[in-house]
Structure formats: structure tokens, C-alpha cells
């Protein structure tokens, strides 16, 4: 735990690209310090980050920092627009770039009043818990993974409200005030029903915004069957881009003039025409080369039309459960389809990175705007950390990386900058004749 005397240069230089988003310089400084805390503070709540701050002179209150970061002075939507402008040059001319669409759960078991936090069954953990559903759009090449947008899905209250309305319904109302209250309840129910967006709706809006800005002209899309919708695929195709998606085994395709489940077709091919599966080698995003046995063919699906299907086995004897991939790129070979699909897992890395390193699910704020700001600042901090330049480490703990910069080294580099500024302050205060107790009182008040 290192006191933060000033914003480290690595963060300050990159945050200057976002200066126009913030009105007041004092508020901008609070946000800079908050982003720094998201990276180096062990407690990534606002209280934990504020406790590390050191100001010379009058120290701003925690309420002042809370207001600057979560309540006023800037727009988180504009922040993400500027963030996409900031990261876009790093993805041009760097080989294959793919935008992955996905969602994750941000758990808050002790925060029932946090915006978007609902108690439901968590199919990942296999139990009931409280969590927010966070939809993400992530772009990646073979070196960088950057979040393009992060949106918290609002809770679906329609069913519970409808049940309440049914239970409290009356045949008649004797008082006008009671009738007015009932009318308001009905109007609010209709309002919430119209405002609610499914995860697929949010993903489509993200793609529409990204394509309208035109910053990632060469990036295709990858997503799993939970995001796959007709509206999404049609929009991507209308922009002259391609998509790759995994599909469920129950999806029906037109095979020999009949509509059949894709797993039925795969089993028939495996048992009767095993020679139709071709051995290929795929160079994945992480540098690994994987061997697969694949069958690919153009097929027709209901509503989606003609697409390319790829059936994948991992063993030469075609044992195990196959995977099924679909793409609108009819001219792509199976190798290119699977290489593009390997970039879909960048979103999983982004989620894990965000939760473990930059505090994506650490905030305890309740209001909708505050929750959005925290997630989006975590997204910005993640990109900053990847761009921190580090030299070759002489420490034994990083020998395993064989000269390749790790996230731990980048965090350490920023922490060293924070430590250096603290030592410089201590040096100056001691030269001014301050006692050890005076310096301790400034750095870590009792």
C-alpha cells in the first residue's frame, strides 16, 4: 500500500487524451487519481482509493472526490467515444483484428441496492447469488486487448410488477386519488416494459455505435450463440463485414432437402463419411498451434439464409463432442474461420483482467450513472496498463517471462513511479526540517 502523492507520469500522459471530457481541472485530477488507484490500490473502492491520496495543503474531502468521479462534470458515454479514438491507432496495421461481443456477471452479494444488482441463478457458479449483467465489446489483435464499451443491463422488473398489479387490482375505485395512484402504477409498468433491453439488444446498439464511428474498418466480429440474433448479423453484413459465431447443437439446417438438427448431421457424417473430415492446423491468437479435424459446407438456415457451417473435432478418431461454427463469409476456409474464432476468447481475458487487476466489480456505488462511470473507468485503466512501457527486468520473479513484459511488470512500473514521487516528497520535507512524525502525519494520518 503506497500513498499516492501525485498521478504517475504513465497515467497522466495517457489521461491527457481525455482532458476535453472533463470541465474542471480539480475534477480531472480526482479522476486521474481514481484511475491510478484502480491499478495499484489493494482496495479498489472509492474509500480505499481516497485513503491512499496525499495532498500538500488542504486535503479535499472524500465527498468531493466522490462527486467528481461519480456524479458531475463529465459524460461516461463521451468518455468511451474518446477511448475508442485513443485505442484505434494501436489496432491499425497490426494484422488480424476482431471485435468480440460477450457478457459477464459482476458479483455483489452484499449490495442489494446497487444498480442492476439482482438475485438470480448464476449458471457459471452453479448457485443463486446477486450480480450485475455486464455486456462488453472488446477489440483485440495479437498484442492488445481493449474494451470498446461496457454497459450494465438494467434489471427486468416487468414480471414482478405485473404480479403486483394483478394482486392489487380492484373492480372499482371510490376515491379519485386512489385511481390516480393506480394509473401512475400502470404507466410506470409500461415505461419499464418499453425501457428494458435484452443483452442482444444492447450488443446490437454497441455494434451500431462502433460502425457509425468508422474507427475499426478492418475488424470482423466473433460471438457465441447467446449473442447471435438475426438483427445483429444483418446489420454487420450491411456494413460489409463478416462474423463468426458458435451455434447450439439443436440448430436446424437444410440437409439434402430436409430440415435436420446439426448434431444429427454431424453424427451421420462421422459414422458414414468420416473421410470428409479434413485435418488442419490453426494458429490461435495466443500463439498456440492447434490441430483439428473439420468438415465445412455452405448450408441454408431458416431466416438466416445461406451460411458456411464448420463442424470441428479435436481428435483424429472423431471422438468427443463436436463444436459447430457459423459464418456469413462463404468464401472463407475453415482455417480462417477458426483463427477468427480464437479472438472471441479475448473478451474472457478482458473480463478476468478487469475483475482481478483494475477492480471492475469492486465498486460499491448504487446509482446508475455512478455504476456506469466505474465500469468505464476500469475499461480505460485496463488499456492504460497494457500501454505502460517497461524495460527488461532484472528481478528473479520475472525470469519466467523470458524478456516479454507481463502485466505484473507493468503494474510494478506504475507502482514504482508512485513510490518515487512519495520518496521525493519525503526528501523535500526532511530538507525543510520536518520531523518524522510530521511526514508520517501527512502520508498516513492516524
Which residues does each predicted region cover?
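A short, flexible helix-boundary coil/loop motif
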Residues: 1-29, 38, 54-56, 154, ...
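Non-catalytic, well-ordered alpha-helical scaffold segments
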Residues: 29-32, 47, 131, 323, ...
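Extended, non-catalytic structural segments that build the interaction scaffolds
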Residues: 33-34, 316, 320-345
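Short amphipathic alpha-helical "interface-anchor" segments enriched in bulky aromatics
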Residues: 101-105, 270, 333-365
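Catalytic-loop motifs flanking and including active-site residues across diverse enzymes
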Residues: 133, 346, 350, 376-379
